[in-house]
Amino acid sequence: VGKLQERRRFLGAAVGGLLVPALPACGGGDDAPPTPTPPEPVPATQITQAIAQLDKLAADLMASSRVPGMAVAVVRGSQTVYAKGFGRRLVTDAAPVDADTVFQLASVSKSLGATVVARQVGRGGIGWETPVRTQLPWFALADADVSAAVTIGDLYAHRSGLPDHAGDRLEDMGYDRQQVLTRLRFVPLHPFRAVYAYTNFGMTAAAEAVAAAAGIDWATLSEQALYQPLGMTRTSSRYADFAARDNRAAGHVRVSGNWVPGTARMPDAQSPAGGVSASVNDMAKWLAMLLGKGEFAGQRVVDAAALAPALSPQMQSNPPSSGRPAGYYGYGFNVGTTELGLTSLNHSGAFALGSATSFMAVPELDLAIVTLTNAQPIGVPETLSAQFFDLVQYGAIRRDWAKLYGDALAPLLEPEGRLVGQPRPANPLPARALSAYTGLYRNDYYGPLQIADQGGTLVMTLGGAPLVVPLSHWDGDVFTFTLDNENAMPGTISQAAFSSDRVWLEYYDHEGLGIFVR
């Protein structure tokens, strides 16, 4: 469990954690950030030279990582000064990636969504401090006071008290957005506004409140509020739009060292947090708006005062360690400073089923980069951002970023379960008659679980899809099952331990919610 949470936490703030030490928080009761040391000036020619090296940097990363495809764009001032594709959309097809190839953004969607919210805040009628329940009367968390008080900003800063990635495993089981959100009331909470815990569905609830206030669904709101005004014609918050595009990048996973097409990732349930797809040409328009403090091509798209809180430290996301300052999160953005004292805005995105993305913007330099790949997260987009901004600031790459990110991610992509790597018992105790285990089991959070004897094999059926999984006997009343999905790495093994009228499913026991009662 801890390994998975660490993997997700790293991916949620990957660039912020290693590349850019962040400013102290001004939320959660901490002191306001001190004024940073005035940054050293960066020569304009040094930026130009860094851009000129991107072709080689990208080609070298493609060669060393062997990721099938990648697209990169750089915005300087209000202009896209670099936009290029590398490699293939699909490893088994020669069709090339270009700057218009559409990729799934994964958690970079959070930053785009935050600018949709900022646009609505600027239009009035809703604010970052608006309680979610004013727009979603049905919304509830485990504590009545928190349910009434939690705001759009709290959920966008990951400080609601919901635990790390609450709701994600419900999505893997086939539950839709509404079904996941209504079940969050069963999840035990951390102290309100005191603990940072990265969630997709907490943020999705906040976005749903904003959409409700606008009277339209989130995907349509995003289109009308952001994508259309910016001319992002190849961007959508609907999976069906991504799937229908001819020039799209397929996800890939690594099997025995080789990249192969992954299972399609359909993230509509958490669309505000992970469901956007876009090209780097479109992302460059969004980055130009970001650098322009809400202005694009001479037009005001997002109110600057409404956008500013999203781009300011709101919650400490990582404690200081190994000589690095703490990391901080705004509303949908990692907010930090580079070693030269320049403010940075960034986010990473990752689908274990085959997508890794990242952007970094430094407003004081009027400069931003975005990198999209169609492969499992191994640190490629973050490495390119780090290399590029090393060249921008210092004229040289100062660390082996590929090794830093690769080493940080490698152990975190391993399977989970106490029995992983364990030999089967040499002399296991026999199971009881299978009829002793069959029946309908109940769990408020995960819903009903059916255990049936199918030709001498126990099979469990659960979730909204539903998920149908055979059980294998391990020892006595303990059986096992395997999973391979967005949150369960290949090789994951879970125990299913029966006792009297209940069964404990190890994989689903996050926050102690893994007991199903018959």
Model features per residue range: what roles?
Residues 86-90, 143-353, 357, 388:
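Short, surface-exposed loop or secondary-structure junction motifs
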Residues 88-91, 376-378, 487, 511:
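A short acidic/small-residue loop/turn micro-motif
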Residues 357-360, 365-374:
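Short, well-ordered beta-strand elements
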Residues 127-143, 230:
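Short, glycine/proline-biased beta-turn/loop segments that scaffold the active-site neighborhood
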Residues 20-42:
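Bacterial Sec-dependent N-terminal signal peptides
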